[in-house]
Amino acid sequence: MDLKIRNARATDAPFLAWLILTAGRAHVKRGIWEVILNLPENDCLSFLELLTVTGAPHLFHHSCYIVAEVEEGTVSGLGGYNPDTHGYPKLIEALPEVYGKMGRFPIREMAAGEPPRITASIPPSVPGAWVIDSVATIPAYRRRGIVDRLLDNILDIGRRKGYRQAQISIYMGNTPAQRAYEKHGFRLLDEWPDPYFQTEIGSPGMARLICDL
């Protein structure tokens, strides 16, 4: 299989929207974005597509992603970012642009300037860590080692930027994902359980993994 890994571009927005939504579902059926937005799947995808091409960068902006492509097209990807310059505060700043383009109002919590309740279980960034996020592969191309190559690539990017540690968060109970990341040197740091998260997502909460670079 002839595989090319490259930086994502604005034209990858439809694929990145699928990737972010799919990564947010992980091993559960209703993902975190569907809970946050409370919209049908197609509307969630439209929202995420616009989110990846906002004027200002943030953790879900296309500039934070690398993708893998084969002759048939783009098949996998993941994000890596500096939480100090591209973290959640920058995401919040970008949201009005997306809602404006969609012609929708923010959900009640965000309209009041508060984060969505479901985000209370998202672990904070480890100080000084390079953060990996939103990992997903098209089903037909899974179990071919593509994510391994992407992970090696994104960890190397963090290493070259001077980071000494990398972090990734997963849903508690997603054992296959945890084992896959452990093969790359990640280890469980802590867990962030939340009954509300369990009710809405179907997972007890989120787990934070870390590795040395």
Give the label of every model feature segment.
Residues 143-156, 179-183:
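Conserved acetyl-CoA-binding loop-helix of GNAT-fold acetyltransferases
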Residues 25-52, 99-101:
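Conserved GNAT-fold acetyl-CoA-binding loop/helix
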Residues 38-65, 70, 118-122:
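Active-site rim helix/loop that mediates acceptor-substrate recognition in acyltransferases
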Residues 67, 73-82, 131, 136:
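Conserved beta-strand in the GNAT
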